[in-house]
Amino acid sequence: MVSIGQMRSLVESTCSKMGDKYASKDAVELVLATGIVESRYEYIRQMGDGPARSFWQVEPASAVDNCQHYLKYRSSLMKNCARASLVDTKYWQMYEEEIW
């Protein structure tokens, strides 16, 4: 398992790059707790043949839906997501599940 202290530091750093609204103590705790529930910070692929990825077990269809129907209309937030994830914004505008 990954050190919870290190995960907290990573989550706090990432949330702060998203903007003040996302860097609150409650927001950080929600993200941290979600990872604990979903994978215990042990797995980055869904067990079995499931499609979910990451410690937070995000399914590609959910990632695409969030990008296409939420972030698409919040360009500033999309840019913050790209910056926080160290991924070019153009990838946040690609809506094919295979990419995610």
Q: Where in the sequence are the language-model features?
A:
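Peptidoglycan-targeting cell-wall enzymes and recognition modules
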Residues: 1-10, 36-100
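An amphipathic alpha-helix signature
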Residues: 8-15, 28
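Helix-loop segments that flank and shape redox-cofactor active sites
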Residues: 15-25
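Short alpha-helical scaffold segments that flank and stabilize functional sites
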Residues: 18, 30, 37-38
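Alpha-helical scaffolds flanking conserved acidic
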Residues: 24-33
